[in-house]
Amino acid sequence: MQFKVISASDLTHNQREQIAKLCFEAFDEDPWSQYAFMQNAVHVIGSVDNVIVSHALWTKRNFTVNTIQNIETAYVEYVTTDLSMRGKGYASQLLKYLIHYLTLSQYPLAALQPEDDEFYKKLGWLPWKGNLYVQNGQSLYQTEDVEILLYPLNKEIEAYLKSQHQLLCTDWREGELW
C-alpha cells in the first residue's frame, strides 16, 4: 500500500469521489457534507494500484489537559477501509503511518472518538479516564457518554497522561463536539 498526505484543498476530483464513497459506505456521510471545518482537514490515504482503499483525516484542535493549555492536537476522524479490503491490515498500516507523520510534524498529541476502541488500543491509543469538556467562549460544558482515545506523540505528553486523568477540554465546534 502506498501512502499520501494531502490537504483537502489539494485533493483531485477523483480522490474526493473515492474518499466520499469510502466514508459514505462506512459512516453514511462524507467528510464534506456537513461541516465547514472539514474543508481545512488533512487527509491520509492508502492506495493499492492507484485506488484509495484506506483513509483517515485530521483537523487541528487545541486541547487542555488538566493545567496544560493549548496543546495542538491532531483530531483524527473518518478512519475507514474499503469493505472488500477489510481484515488485511490496511487501516492499521494507515494509522501507523499517520502517527509517524504526525510525530515528524511535531504534533504533541493525537485524539479520536472511536467506534471500535479495541482496534485502536491494540495500536497504542490510550483511553481518557477523566472528565471531558468543550469550551464555548468563557463557558465550559461537560460532555458525557463520550469516549476519547489519545495518542501521545512526545515523551513529555506521554508521561503527563500516564499520571494525570482529571480534565480534558477542547474548543467548541459545529456538529459533533468530539
Predicted regions mapped to residue ranges:
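C-terminal "cap" of GNAT-fold acetyltransferases
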Residues: V134-W178
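Short acidic (Asp/Glu) patches
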Residues: T59, L94-L98, K129-N136
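Conserved acetyl-CoA pyrophosphate-binding loop and the N-cap/start of the following alpha-helix
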Residues: M85-Y97
